[in-house]
């Protein structure tokens, strides 16, 4: 008999066989319940924005300046300056951002958590964050890790003689990992072409991914799958940087500007490097990549396996990157770790050693650096920057600011004394309120005008939903403020039914103009406000039809953006490929429609009950795209009833698929065989999925109609105001 002590607890944090193990295709609702108050250690009344406003930013920057040149024996600074390390840390914090779904980025300080803290591309950034801990400890809750990581990158640049474009705080920390799809691969840095490859066809990268391999931020610096071909690498660079909202000029500026500083590390073989932080022993205290190669640090450090220093002044802003790029011819070589890199042919040794002042080296470059010379489009930009240093400096400053602030959303979220005054197109600018706002009496009068305009409840509700539901909690873009639903590209999106939308907007514009023309004190209502107000009027009427008196909350203050304030290409990524709330799929996808619904709900920051009540309410209000009848489980559309749930849960109905793709279903009366309803996967999932069915049963109960209406109104109001950072 074994004498090994057996733990009496089998259901501990150490894990066990999970539901996901048993049913790997089960719909995952966990993403709707991340970052709740249960994981947040701060007091309930803690307001990070107010805490940051009390911060002495200048004092923090002085401490960071001192840190830059205070080398620590446990992780010595290259060239006696941590600037290059901290630039990389900030870049990699922000650089996970991707435009397709707005996820990733610096907000929340996710670099502290798995998987990002253990990505191969983030090797030894754990040391950078530990170097920062005394400063974070000193200022505590007044500066988040998320803000500190980016501020440190800015100070690093400034300490090396570069003038940055500005800095904004306002990134509140999160306290657990995001649940983000980073790819299907099961092996770090797995090459393309495998069974879980993110590439298909002619090297077409899977959406929404924005990196070429699992565990990389953007591209493989050795070239595609390690092939040292600068021209082929340029294609990867262009694709991945575009997916992070950067054009060619911004891309060249970022690569050249970032690689003006510091060095890469590849002193020895990767086999000497220990496990990443999440796999390291508990005694490592959250650090990883412990190296057995010589001292394992400083001159002996191994990070990427590459051993490259780009400029002769790696701790000072200079023009050396382009000077070296164009002044030399380059020959392929290998680092001490065996990685492909390039060395200047026949060049003098002008590059300082990071730890031995008596040594010099020839200039070296990465394959992806040479892309800036050998790709024709990049070469033109690089030559222009080479010949115009001031233009290059300005381009890098602006691109760095964009990189580090892209996921913050509108300027209303920016905090601190270093926020640049210039308004930038990628910030989706909206005019500031310049007139008196409507009051409660005006709201009541406008609701009456809207209801008397001839527009139906379905038209009012679907238009307001279309306007507000573009919001993404990931990068804080979209939403009803700005009324961009009336502008390109949103007015032409298929999901918005352009012809029908134009008619609704024309009617609402007539109501708006009549109201504004009648005012004598300069009071106005914006179309952005009126669209939301009209939706509220429609819901109140629909609730009244159900016998429930309710007032939908409304806060004026939205403004109307202009077409000139709207970047059409940047706005295009907000177009829904699916909106289960409106029973819409743009085309067939490998991902099930119900998973796309949950993804949309997560971007709208909704939880399970909010998702459930909104779908049920929008169905009976007739908000489906194209007036489709799928999921309209009621004989009284336009009435805010709980009929969707009552009829879905009715055991007198038997459901069967009627499409080859199993995406459309008929519900027939079990007794007569007659078709009662039709529905899609996003309808039937509320009866099929055990958690969603439990929620549906709450709203389908005999005593639930009033609760359903009030919960629907609360969830609706939340969506309508997701972008109202001015109300915070």
UniProtKB/Swiss-Prot annotation:
Keyword Metal-binding: yes
Top-rank taxon, per record: Bacteria
Disulfide bonds: none
PANTHER family: CATALASE-PEROXIDASE, HYDROPEROXIDASE I, BIFUNCTIONAL CATALASE-PEROXIDASE
Organism: Burkholderia ambifaria (strain MC40-6)
HAMAP family to which the protein is assigned, alphabetical: Catal_peroxid (MF_01961)
PTM statement from Swiss-Prot or TrEMBL: Formation of the three residue Trp-Tyr-Met cross-link is important for the catalase, but not the peroxidase activity of the enzyme.
Keyword vocabulary terms for this entry: Heme, Hydrogen peroxide, Iron, Metal-binding, Oxidoreductase, Peroxidase
Full protein name: Catalase-peroxidase 1
Site annotation Transition state stabilizer: residues: 88
Cross-link (Tryptophyl-tyrosyl-methioninium (Tyr-Met) (with W-91)): 218-244
